[in-house]
Regions:
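C-terminal alpha-helix plus adjacent terminal tail
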Residues: 1-15, 49, 167-173, 192, ...
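Conserved CoA-thioester-binding segment of acyl-CoA-metabolizing enzymes
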Residues: 1-60, 94
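Terminal peptide-recognition signature
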Residues: 20, 24, 39, 57, ...
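Glycine- (often His-adjacent) and acidic-residue-rich active-site loop
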Residues: 37, 51, 59-92, 111, ...
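Catalytic-core regions built around general acid/base machinery
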Residues: 42, 88-100
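Hydrophobic alpha-helical segments typical of transmembrane helices
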Residues: 81, 88, 92, 147-150, ...
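Crotonase-fold acyl-CoA enzyme core
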Residues: 95-207, 241, 246-249, 255
Length: 262
């Protein structure tokens, strides 16, 4: 991107929260290859920022994201472009779970196809009551093969298949019922509520948040016995940490903890 180009992704700080905004309103914040590359760079920057404890991901304009840029796809009909685009998308989506800090999606308008994939890939997600979600690729002869990866790992099989096979829009209340998002708020309340959640998380130990997120995602693919063995070792490691000793002492003495690793 040259100095004259508009940033497709912007980054602002609000205390210990990094606000990451998809900034391509003219395309409904479509996940073009360039936007995905910028998003990955900003996510890495925020992950490495020791003053950031939580990331909030949102979009400008009329919607969160309408998914991949179909005009760009239509203009680049070759395997190399398809692979580069989808690999850039995979890089972002997998990094969201590998990232050491919690990521919250603040969703409005629409989140469709790869935009819905992005919501499903975040740790938490909140939407306003006007938001609509879909994996509508089937309607244009292009099944949502890559979006289904996090969607099917976030919501139940029958709900996933219903979204994928019908391609219909669902409202925010239905998305909450499916488990795609955590809660629904009125449009004028959404950002305030998301920041309340973010700041509550910020009050916790950075060390514990990082360790807990890592444990959660690593154990998901393990067999039950293996998961318990892994989680037991992580619990022992956590119990020996300075912040655990501080937190337990604060609880027992009825005072607020003073985290050492925050």
């Amino acid at each position: 991107m040259n100095s004259q180009s508009k940033a497709l992704v912007t980054l602002q700080k609000e205390e210990e929260v990094s606000l990451i905004t998809l900034n391509d309103e003219s395309s409904f914040n479509s996940l073009s290859e360039n936007l995905l590359k910028e998003l990955f760079a900003v996510l890495k920057e925020s992950d490495q920022d020791v003053t950031t404890k939580v990331l909030v991901l949102k979009g400008v304009g009329r919607g969160f994201s309408a998914g991949h840029n179909l005009k760009e796809v239509q203009e680049n009909q070759n395997d190399d472009f398809y692979r580069d685009l989808l690999n850039s998308c995979k890089e972002v989506m997998t990094f969201l779970s590998n990232l050491s800090k919690p990521v919250i999606a603040e969703v409005h308008g629409v989140a469709t196809a790869a935009g819905c994939q992005l919501v499903a890939s975040c740790d938490l997600a909140y939407a306003d009551s006007d938001t609509r979600f879909a994996t509508p690729g089937v309607n244009i002869g292009l099944f949502c093969h890559t979006p289904l990866v996090p969607v099917s790992r976030t919501i139940a099989k029958k709900h996933s298949m219903e979204m994928l096979l019908l391609g219909d829009l669902i409202d925010a209340t239905e998305a909450k019922r499916f488990g795609l998002i955590n809660d629904v708020f009125e449009p004028e309340e959404l950002h305030k509520k998301v920041m309340e959640v973010a700041k509550t998380i910020c009050s916790k130990s950075s060390y514990v948040l990082k360790m807990g997120k890592e444990t959660f995602y690593k154990q998901l693919d393990m067999e039950l016995e293996e998961a318990y063995e892994y989680a037991t070792e992580r619990m022992i490691e956590n119990l020996k940490a300075e912040d655990a000793r501080e937190g337990i002492d604060a609880f027992l003495t009825k005072r607020n903890p003073n985290w050492k690793n925050s």
